[in-house]
Amino acid sequence: MSQEIGPTDAAGPRVCPIADALDIVGERWTLLVLRELAFGVSRFKEIQVNTGAPRETLSLRLRKLEEYRLIERRRYCEHPPRDEYVLTQAGQDLQPVLRSLREWGERHAAPAARA
């Protein structure tokens, strides 16, 4: 590993890529949104239903993911205006992370694992 993981100096820049990544994808609902997009779900309402995210929160998460270029918004209907969302290459690069989180959750966070 080329960079050390540890506490940061409050006066200096952070040098932890994990913390940097969590600044982007660590908010509630964000990883579930990325999961849905990885599954091929692309429309706002479907993402909202499948994740349970509140409408306003989902809008904020989608905007942030677009700002960080993890997703791209595409217009699929002009009247009324309707958009869909797709993963960019950077978003697709997170799929192994999502897979690992799912596997970890199955082993350690599922109700049977806690019993």
Give residue ranges: language-model regions:
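Glycine-centered, phosphate/nucleic-acid-interacting loop/turn motifs that mediate DNA/RNA or nucleotide
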Residues: 29, 69-70
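N-terminal helix-turn-helix DNA-binding core of bacterial DNA-binding proteins
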Residues: 12-57, 78, 86
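Residues within the DNA-recognition helix of helix-turn-helix
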Residues: 61
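N-terminal intrinsically disordered/low-complexity leader segments
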Residues: 1-13
